[in-house]
Amino acid sequence: MKIVIQRVKEASVSIDGEIAGAIDQGLLLLVGIGPDDQAEDIDYAVRKISHMRIFSDPEGKMNLSIQDIGGSVLSVSQFTLYADTKKGNRPAFTGAAKPAMASELYDTFNAQLEQLVPVQRGVFGADMQISLTNDGPVTIILDTKHR
């Protein structure tokens, strides 16, 4: 799994002009699923994201997790994180998992994360528009294959 984690003041995802999910302070996750991803990757990602201390404490030090601040997550599927740009000018996405497998793992990831923090989500495979106000900015890339 490849996940772009962005600390946000607020974020929303819309489909055809209708808001599908929205959060206030928390994390926007752009979630890509690879063909070799398994339950262990989901467990690792959920544990890291829910405990990652990237929110400021009263002294301004990044010392608090999403759980500590009572924040929420907006999770958006993003197969383009597996783009291969080595050849030519058009990216290839053959490194991403097939849609049926990716959808199942994405749903499992969100369900596990939702046991720890509130989760709003986009619609898998839909053409979505994302609005956000970055906080920091703080942007972290988590790759479950690089542990």
From Swiss-Prot:
Motif (Gly-cisPro motif, important for rejection of L-amino acids): 136-137
UniProt-listed InterPro entries: Daa-tRNA_deacyls_DTD, DTD-like_sf
Keywords: Cytoplasm, Hydrolase, RNA-binding, tRNA-binding
GO cellular component: cytoplasm
BP-aspect Gene Ontology terms: D-amino acid catabolic process
Main subcellular location of this protein, as a coarse class: cytoplasm
Enzyme class: hydrolase
Domain of life: Bacteria
Name of a matching Pfam family: Tyr_Deacylase
GO molecular function: D-tyrosyl-tRNA(Tyr) deacylase activity; Gly-tRNA(Ala) deacylase activity; Ser(Gly)-tRNA(Ala) hydrolase activity; tRNA binding
Compartments, as annotated in UniProt: Cytoplasm
Catalytic activity annotation: glycyl-tRNA(Ala) + H2O = tRNA(Ala) + glycine + H(+); a D-aminoacyl-tRNA + H2O = a tRNA + a D-alpha-amino acid + H(+)
The protein's Enzyme Commission number: 3.1.1.96
Known partners and oligomeric status: Homodimer.
UniProt domain comment: A Gly-cisPro motif from one monomer fits into the active site of the other monomer to allow specific chiral rejection of L-amino acids.
Stated role: An aminoacyl-tRNA editing enzyme that deacylates mischarged D-aminoacyl-tRNAs. Also deacylates mischarged glycyl-tRNA(Ala), protecting cells against glycine mischarging by AlaRS. Acts via tRNA-based rather than protein-based catalysis; rejects L-amino acids rather than detecting D-amino acids in the active site. By recycling D-aminoacyl-tRNA to D-amino acids and free tRNA molecules, this enzyme counteracts the toxicity associated with the formation of D-aminoacyl-tRNA entities in vivo and helps enforce protein L-homochirality.
Family: Belongs to the DTD family.
HAMAP family in alphabetical order: Deacylase_Dtd
Record-given protein name: D-aminoacyl-tRNA deacylase
Gene: dtd
